[in-house]
Amino acid sequence: MGDLSIQNLVVEYYSGGYALRPINGLNLDVAAGSLVMLLGPSGCGKTTLLSCLGGILRPKSGAIKFDEVDITTLQGAELANYRRNKVGIVFQAFNLVPSLTAVENVMVPLRSAGMSRRASRRRAEELLARVNLAERMNHRPGDLSGGQQQRVAVARAIALDPPLILADEPTAHLDFIQVEEVLRLIRELADGERVVVVATHDSRMLPMADRVVELTPDFAETNRPPETVHLQAGEVLFEQSTMGDLIYVVSEGEFEIVHELADGGEELVKVAGPGDYFGEIGVLFHLPRSATVRARSDATAVGYTVQAFRERLGVGGLRDLIEHRALAND
């Protein structure tokens, strides 16, 4: 089993004609035998990253190396072999076949890999016993609790003993007793040389992680001094899909606010002049920037943290910012 290395990963997709990058320049190194938690709210790129690691989604650029093999370059039979033998995925919705029993669900990847029916059933029974479902193996998913279904999904994911396990929100929709069962099982999976990557927004899972990766940075609200930025015409202040912690107010010149489109073009949203501000929504809600901003002419802008913006410019609560209320005079 090997190490996992993610190098300058960029994932881009299109929504409503606009280009979005939920993952933009991610770098991450994970040693074999590690349990990694991807922490962040919905929409921050956790599931997108798991899809790339699983060979389901191809990134725009960058590399994902597992055991020294760049999986972003795999195609055809090599990619199919990676998906079947190198990675196991535990989906948030379990993805169990309703008409099959627990043991039959676990047998699916084994049979697909060419194992005989007798051997695959024996292996499936061993796995279900390992996750404490020996007495429920002949029950269909509809007769199992949420926690039991999740354990069947885990047993299926490790059926071919893959060195990489990916789990997407494994504690979603489970009660506290079921959560405890799943947490213990996931921790056991990372023992040895296997790499386990878990996407979650559940902070209860963090203590058992070897490493926590915050996909949405937790910017601290501070009263640090405003940052003045001078740009020449054509220079970019920030790019669409990047993260930031400053709200900008134009003091001189003009800035273009543009959406990057799926066809590589741009859509002008607004020209901001002296007294205008922009970039507040992403900062307030810890979202990626929704547009690219560049100087239309030689221009100057001042960047404020949320707290400094409220205090120094007379803006009160979130509603004032979201409704883009006019700024008070200094």
From Swiss-Prot:
Family: Belongs to the ABC transporter superfamily.
Organism (species): Mycobacterium tuberculosis (strain ATCC 25618 / H37Rv)
Positions with a binding annotation for ATP: 40-47
Keyword Nucleotide-binding among UniProt keywords: yes
Function: Probably part of an ABC transporter complex. Probably responsible for energy coupling to the transport system.
Assembly, per entry: The complex is composed of two ATP-binding proteins (Rv0073), two transmembrane proteins (Rv0072) and a solute-binding protein.
Listed GO biological process terms: transmembrane transport
Keyword list, A-Z: ATP-binding, Isopeptide bond, Nucleotide-binding, Transport, Ubl conjugation
Protein name from the UniProt record: Uncharacterized ABC transporter ATP-binding protein Rv0073
Record-linked SUPFAM superfamilies: cAMP-binding domain-like, P-loop containing nucleoside triphosphate hydrolases
Segments forming domain ABC transporter: 4-242
Record-listed a nucleoside 3',5'-cyclic phosphate binding positions: 210-330
PROSITE patterns in alphabetical order: ABC_TRANSPORTER_1, ABC_TRANSPORTER_2, CNMP_BINDING_2, CNMP_BINDING_3
Cross-link (Isoglutamyl lysine isopeptide (Lys-Gln) (interchain with Q-Cter in protein Pup)): 65
Domain of life: Bacteria
GO molecular function, one term: transmembrane transporter activity
GO CC, one annotated term: plasma membrane
SMART domains documented for this protein: AAA, cNMP
